[in-house]
């Protein structure tokens, strides 16, 4: 005779909470993508005025990121002038932005000691500084590209063509948002074939004009199309813009293992994990 045991709701809920916080911590602790320390004959050594100005700037970024999701600053004079900026992705709240910028400003100094130019990419933000003015200049490099390992299902048909079309539409829309609260940020969710969603995000640095924003996003999209358009998700960060997409299923796709094209990164997983816990909880409590 078989006996069916039912878990108590309290035990189930406690287990789900433990699983959620464990997975959430794993994601949040590994969201650094890439750091680029630009080598130059202008690099400094020791406790210079330039380094002091840089530290002042990064401290200001940590404070300002608790208020706004993008900011730029110039500190110092003549050869000791530092130009810098931070930019958070438009889909994160101000707390997440602040945490990301705090981590980025600490890591960029730790990894790029005495460099007069550097850029660091996190999933939720980027921080950059230089001894040269760069804010309105369109630049393709250095960039960081990531994708999942899992291939998209054949049932989606000619996905590359469909992806190019939908992302192209998002880019056109983004270029009209230069005066938005989060300039040039656009997020789109499109249902494919009943059970698949295409989530696409595009965003430019607010200092670009609309023409250069479009050029940057089109370049970034082409990079993703060339390397990763057969994958469940992919993202690219450049000095001036971000592009990423993710295919999701109902209720959830398997969490993809990351494949890196130029650095180190993890998956943005908080929302997927959260909804996964909700769905699992609903199933458990029906028993």
UniProtKB/Swiss-Prot annotation:
Keywords recorded for this protein, A-Z: Glycoprotein, Repeat, Secreted, Signal
Superkingdom of the organism of origin: Eukaryota
Any single Gene Ontology cellular-component annotation: extracellular region
One Pfam family matching this protein: Stress-antifung
Keyword Zinc: no
Name of the featured protein: Cysteine-rich repeat secretory protein 59
Predominant subcellular localization, coarse grouping: secreted
Record domain Gnk2-homologous: where: 32-134, 140-250
Gene source species: Arabidopsis thaliana
Glycan-bearing residues: 43, 47, 63, 72, 93, 103, 111, 212
Originating gene: CRRSP59
Subcellular location: Secreted
Signal peptide bounds: 1-26
Gene3D superfamilies linked: Gnk2 domain, C-X8-C-X2-C motif (3.30.430.20)
Family assignment from sequence similarity: Belongs to the cysteine-rich repeat secretory protein family.
């Amino acid at each position: 005779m078989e006996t069916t045991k039912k878990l108590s709701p309290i035990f189930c809920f406690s287990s789900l909470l433990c699983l959620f916080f464990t997975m959430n911590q794993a994601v949040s602790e590994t969201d650094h993508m890439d750091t680029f320390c630009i080598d130059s004959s202008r690099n400094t050594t020791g406790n210079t005025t330039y380094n002091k100005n840089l530290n002042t700037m990064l401290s200001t970024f940590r404070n300002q990121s608790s208020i706004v999701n993008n900011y730029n600053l110039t500190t110092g004079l003549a050869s000791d002038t530092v130009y810098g900026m931070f930019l958070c992705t438009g889909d994160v709240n101000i707390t997440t932005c602040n945490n990301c910028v705090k981590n980025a400003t600490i890591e960029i100094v730790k990894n790029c000691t005495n460099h007069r130019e550097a850029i660091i990419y996190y999933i939720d933000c980027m921080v950059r500084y230089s001894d040269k003015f760069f804010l309105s200049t369109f630049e393709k490099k250095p960039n960081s590209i990531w994708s999942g390992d899992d291939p998209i299902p054949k049932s989606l048909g000619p996905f590359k063509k469909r992806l190019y079309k939908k992302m192209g539409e998002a880019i056109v829309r983004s270029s009209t948002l230069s005066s938005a609260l989060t300039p040039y940020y656009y997020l789109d969710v499109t249902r494919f074939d009943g059970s698949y969603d295409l989530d696409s995000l595009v965003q430019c640095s607010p200092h670009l004009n609309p023409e250069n924003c479009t050029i940057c996003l089109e370049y970034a999209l082409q990079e993703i199309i060339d390397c990763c358009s057969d994958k469940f998700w992919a993202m690219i960060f450049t000095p001036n813009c971000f592009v990423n997409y993710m295919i999701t299923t109902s209720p959830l796709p398997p969490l993809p293992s990351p494949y890196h094209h130029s650095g180190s990164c993890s998956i943005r997983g908080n929302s997927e994990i959260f909804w996964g816990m909700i769905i699992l909880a609903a199933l458990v409590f029906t028993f």
